[in-house]
Amino acid sequence: RVEPAAREGGAGIGAVLVVAGDDLHRQAGGAGGFGGRGGFQAPPARGEDILIDIGGPERLSLHAATIAPESACTSMQLHLQVSPGDFATNWNAAQVIAGPQLALGANSPFFFGHELWSETRIELFTQATDTRPEELKTQGVRPRVWFGERWITSIFDLFEENVRYFPSLLPELSDEDPVAELAAGRTPKLSELRLHNGTIYRWNRPVYDVVGGRPHLRVENRVLPAGPTVLDMLANSAFYYGLLRALADDDRPIWTKLSFAAAERNFRAAAQYGIDARLYWPGYGEVTADELVLRELLPLAHEGLRQWG
């Protein structure tokens, strides 16, 4: 009932509502399969089916043989190309923004016929791609989808975490010798680094890429769902880019006054409760998301957009 009503009003919902039971057991892989090449690897890495267990106004509990449930999640990804020296500042700012950003943009309350979180996509994607069996969870092994655990001082902090915490799911090697490429005056593609990084799903992902022989770094913001309308998506994008600029340019960065754990709690609260979430912010304490946005964050976003020109 929800999908036709939304379509009639010109709005899209951030999670596919027509996933059927057979879809959850479809074999992954190939160009048309759920999850691409990684779909083959997730269940073997676990050694068991994937349990999806999400609370909310209604509770959903089911098992899936592959990571197919994550394919129901639709997102809008926002990219910002930055210099190496500015990467850490912008990534930290994006992490701070994630909670308020999601509170405003939550658009995936339904999945598999159940009303769950305001942005169910966050928890659904987290659980559907979790390759850890229970014993590894209790040992503190990190999940493939995660918010992170600390503020950073360099993009290398994140790439070092990739190597330290996450075994390769797709052990493919290229013939490139990066040192030889540099010595020859060419830009190394670092294919192994990029492939491995692509199997780790941070909500703000570091990206190294090469276009036309020129390397660059990007912050890939993966927080927002798609929809509900093009106008909403443009407004959410403007809020993100404006607030990101304002926080990144602040002489006393907000993350020096906000613990990383508090930023993660904001993110999860926003995923569960959307605009009704209560968020922590320095100088305000715990405050409703709408009050925080209206009193503090919209003016900052406006100033940030002005700085962008």
How should each PLM-predicted stretch be described?
Residues G12-V18:
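Generic short N-terminal amphipathic or hydrophobic helices
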